[in-house]
Amino acid sequence: MSLKDSAKIALSLMDLTTLNDNDTDEKVITLCQQGKTEFGTPAAVCVYPRFVPIARKALKAQGTEQVKIATVTNFPHGNNDIDIAVAETKAAVAYGADEVDVVFPYKALMAGNEQIGFELVQQCKAVCQASNVLLKVIIETGELKTAELIRKASEISIKAGADFIKTSTGKVPVNATLEYARIMLETIRDLNVADRVGFKAAGGVKTAEEAAQYLALAQEILGHDWVNSDHFRFGASSLLTNLLAALNGQANQKVSGY
């Protein structure tokens, strides 16, 4: 597959993201506008819950209402208070989110507690399922670090009802890596849930070349046809600029951002 071909696919799989403390309505509107490209639109935009209504309005105004709106809960620290995570998820759904990316209580798992993670995901899933909202679970691979813990967090999340497992918040020193992605994709394969569980690489995927490596990895493990927006996403902001440069046949630009 050529770089242009993989860049076009990667664009269609993006959750175009802004999750900054200084986000404003204007920045969210600009994000939505950036997602309307001559090469198509991303799968979703991802914003903080309070910006979901403004994103909905912006997407509709520009004729791209097919773009989903994702948001985050229990973010970014993955605290182990189930009630707060559930309350935040209920609020996110009430704001009108199509998808919720909840942070798994990874520190509890690192301390040996598997139950909190299971219950938190299970209860958030119940909230989402009642409103036909997709639930992605961020396991924070760069903090879990070991293959054993990454696999365990993936398994717990899947068994508790996750629709997607996601590498990272983008708020810690180490985010998505191909090594971590392989463990998560192989867990989806080994549990025989590829028909109902997807994978999202977030943070650290910045170039068309890097995106192509993730696509190739997913195709190797789960098959060519599996890689579509129902099963695979990139969480990114700066990646879009680079993909558009590749699609326009320009040399890669150095970009900063998530």
Swiss-Prot record:
Protein name: Deoxyribose-phosphate aldolase
Protein's cellular compartments: Cytoplasm
A Pfam family: DeoC
Any one GO BP annotation for this protein: deoxyribonucleotide catabolic process
One Gene Ontology MF term: deoxyribose-phosphate aldolase activity
Protein purpose: Catalyzes a reversible aldol reaction between acetaldehyde and D-glyceraldehyde 3-phosphate to generate 2-deoxy-D-ribose 5-phosphate.
Primary site of residence: cytoplasm
Gene3D superfamilies, sorted: Aldolase class I
UniProt pathway: Carbohydrate degradation; 2-deoxy-D-ribose 1-phosphate degradation; D-glyceraldehyde 3-phosphate and acetaldehyde from 2-deoxy-alpha-D-ribose 1-phosphate: step 2/2
Source species, domain of life: Bacteria
Active-site residues (renumbered): 101, 166, 200
The reaction(s) this protein catalyses: 2-deoxy-D-ribose 5-phosphate = D-glyceraldehyde 3-phosphate + acetaldehyde
EC number from the UniProt entry: 4.1.2.4
Keyword annotations: Cytoplasm, Lyase, Schiff base
Organism expressing this protein natively: Actinobacillus pleuropneumoniae serotype 5b (strain L20)
Keyword Flavoprotein attributed: no
InterPro entries the record matches: Aldolase_TIM (IPR013785), DeoC (IPR011343), DeoC/FbaB/LacD_aldolase (IPR002915), DeoC_typeII (IPR023649)
Disulfide cross-links: none
Family, per entry: Belongs to the DeoC/FbaB aldolase family. DeoC type 2 subfamily.
SMART domains on file: DeoC
One annotated Gene Ontology cellular component of this protein: cytoplasm
